[in-house]
Amino acid sequence: MEIQKYNLSCIADRAYSMGFVLLQACNTRYIRPYGKLMQHQISYAIKNEKGKIDNYAKFVDQLEETLLDVQSAKIGLEPAELKLKTMNEWWLIGKYAKENNCVDDIADVFCSHKMTTSNYTENIGPYTFVYSNCPLISDPIDVYLVK
């Protein structure tokens, strides 16, 4: 994976699906104490001619094998073990993510008071969404209708 070229340390608060894959590609993986991870089996929806579907299914099989190899090598599992764990979604929180070697350590991070209390806005249609500059606060702190 491209991300593996760089010596990146990553901190996860939520890493679901492809976020889980990206976290496993990081050199050093951290999770917040109540951070959450989830990985699931590869899934897709498709409709087309049978030949195209068959070819695409082979491609998805290749992709699944590649992603299982990358993730299982970092976690220390056999690909078949990881495939079984992710069959019906594999959810982990904080210390359990560390116990299962999905992260290297637990790290609690905080935003400064200045970052937490400053904000930015996004206008979407008739609404203005106000967000904190702290990336740990993902939901809008205010939403109002533009008049």
Where are these regions (language model features)?
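N-terminal organellar transit peptides
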Residues: 1-147
